[in-house]
Amino acid sequence: MKTKTDFLRMKQKGEPITMLTAYDYPSAKLVEEAEVDMILVGDSLGMVVLGYDSTVPVTVEDMIHHTKAVRRGAKDTFVVTDMPFMSYHVSLAETMHHARRIVQEGGAHALKVEGAGEVISTIHYLTNAGIPVVAHLGLTPQSVGILGGYKVQGKDAESAKQLIADAKKCEDAGAIALVLECVPMQLAKIISDELTIPTIGIGAGKDVDGQVLVYHDLISYGVNRVPKFVKQYTAVQDEIVRGISQYVAEVKTRQFPEDQYSFTMKEEEYVALYGGKQG
C-alpha cells in the first residue's frame, strides 16, 4: 500500500497520482484491482449513493459505515475519508471525537476537510494528534450555499491570490495533500509549483500532481448528468438497464428460469411424492 511518503515521492518524480471515490465493498474492490493509488470515501456519497440533493445531510455515522465497507474491499489501498458537514466546525474536542471515530472505527488512513480560515487550525490540531489530513480548496461542496452554487473559483486575480495564500497555509498546518476543485488550470499550476505537498485536481486542469473523479461519474452509473470536467470512460448503466429489462421480459414470458438454472429430484423420489402427482 502506498503511503503519504510515497505520494510525496511521486510528486517529486513527476509521477501522476490517481485517486477515485469508492463507497462500498464492490466498488472499492474494483478500484483496487484497477491499481488506483488512493481511494476517497467522499461525502459525495450523499448524492450519488443516498440520493440527497447535496452533501449536507451526510453524517459521521454514514462516513464510518461506508469507510468500513471500502476498507473491506480495498485492503491494500490508501483510503482518505471526508469529514462531513459541521463535523469539524465545532469545538476542537468535538472535532477530535468525530475524527477519532472515523479513523478508529471506520479505518480511514487520512481525513479530508474543506476550506481554509478556521479550518487551518483544525488541520494543525489533527496533524499534531497524528491524524493525516488532506485539505480541499476551490469549490468546496459543503459551502455551495455561501459560494453561490457550483461555480469555478479563483477566476479573478484577487480570489486567485487568496487561494494561493490559503494553499500555503494548509501546507504549513501539516496537510499531506491538497485537493483543488473547479479552479482555472493556470491557477492550479501555480499552486502545484509552489507547494511541496501533492495537489490532486478535480476540474483543475492537467498541471497538478494527480487527478480525482467520482466513481459513478467516471463509469456513468446512476447519474443523469455530469460536470464539465468529467470524462466518462464507459457507460455501465446502459448495460445494467439492458440486462434488467431482458430479465423482466423473460420472466413475463416464462423463458426464465430455463432448466439449466433449476434443480430436479430423482424420478423415484418424485413418484414417491403423491405418486408423482401434486397433492
Swiss-Prot record:
Q: Which InterPro entries match?
A: Pantoate_hydroxy_MeTrfase, Pyrv/PenolPyrv_kinase-like_dom, Pyrv_kinase-like_dom_sf
Q: How is the cofactor bound?
A: Binds 1 Mg(2+) ion per subunit.
Query: What positions does the entry give for 3-methyl-2-oxobutanoate binding?
Result: 43-44, 82, 112
Reactions performed catalytically:
3-methyl-2-oxobutanoate + (6R)-5,10-methylene-5,6,7,8-tetrahydrofolate + H2O = 2-dehydropantoate + (6S)-5,6,7,8-tetrahydrofolate
Which cofactors does the annotated protein need, by name?
Mg(2+)
Q: What subcellular compartments does it reside in? A: Cytoplasm
Top-level taxon: Bacteria
Any GO MF annotation of the entry? magnesium ion binding
- SUPFAM superfamilies attached here? Phosphoenolpyruvate/pyruvate domain
ATP-binding is among the record's keywords: no
- Function of this protein? Catalyzes the reversible reaction in which hydroxymethyl group from 5,10-methylenetetrahydrofolate is transferred onto alpha-ketoisovalerate to form ketopantoate.
Q: What is this protein called?
A: 3-methyl-2-oxobutanoate hydroxymethyltransferase
Q: Which organism is it from?
A: Bacillus cytotoxicus (strain DSM 22905 / CIP 110041 / 391-98 / NVH 391-98)
What lineage is on file?
Bacteria, Bacillati, Bacillota, Bacilli, Bacillales
What gene is behind this protein?
panB
